[in-house]
Regions:
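N-terminal glycine-/serine-/threonine-rich phosphate-binding loop
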Residues: 1-3, 8, 194, 204
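C-terminal cap/substrate-recognition subdomain and adjoining C-terminal extension
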Residues: 72, 76-94, 101-214
Length: 214
């Protein structure tokens, strides 16, 4: 039996919001603006597509800064993530990351967790590492993108059980494609997640108990 579990990255596998930390590197004013936009999007107050390019234009990140955020993801990794993912894989689960974050930032964390499949937004840089743009057609740059990707991966892997773990409204959108949605509240307890998630976990190790009958 093929089993697929997808994890959000920011405020789930790691305690930080990568885009906010990139903004912090650009200065206090940029950080405040970007943090506000991120919170509004994660709470479902404004569509993701409305803020995606605005945040990156404000930040103008370099490749080096993105790699620094990769290190920050590792430093702030959810304490039970490594062991939980290792146990899930031993139980036959295919573990993937589906994120509205950036591939360049997430790769180091994924490698540490031994997750080979990352569905996240590609950024483009010139030969000096200066920011050129992002893939504006990538599904997770808009609302509805995560269920689209989860459906594609589930089909490609012929998964009979599909699970999503995440903290935000964009993650909750996958419920229906995912036969189980687990709202994650360790770092952010968002009202829509608390009210609408069939399962809640405050640490990733609790995912193992929730899925013990699968």
């Amino acid at each position: 039996m093929n089993k697929l579990i997808a994890f959000d990255c920011d405020s789930t596998l790691s305690g930080i919001e990568g885009v906010d930390e990139l903004a912090r590197l650009a200065g206090d004013d940029v950080f405040r603006q970007v943090e506000d936009l991120t919170n509004q999007a994660m709470n479902g107050e404004i569509p993701i597509e409305e803020i995606f390019s605005r945040r990156l234009e404000l930040i103008n990140p370099t490749r080096h800064q993105c790699l620094e955020i990769g290190k920050a993801y590792l430093e702030e990794i959810e304490p039970t993530a490594k062991e939980t993912i290792s146990k899930l894989k031993k139980q036959g689960w295919e573990c993937i990351i589906i994120s509205g974050g950036f591939v360049t930032c997430i790769e180091e964390l994924a490698e540490y967790l031994e997750i080979s499949s990352i569905e996240a937004v590609p950024l483009y840089f010139n030969e000096n590492g200066d920011y050129l743009g992002f893939d504006s057609d990538y599904p997770t740059t808009r609302n509805g993108g995560k269920p689209e990707l989860l459906k594609k991966v589930a089909k490609n892997t012929s998964a009979e059980h599909v699970v999503m773990v995440g903290d935000g409204v964009s993650d909750l959108e996958t419920f229906g494609i995912a036969d189980r949605f687990i709202g994650f509240t360790r770092y952010a307890a968002r009202q829509q997640i608390l009210e609408n998630s069939p399962h809640i976990a405050s640490e990733l190790s609790q995912v193992l108990d929730i899925l013990k009958d699968c």
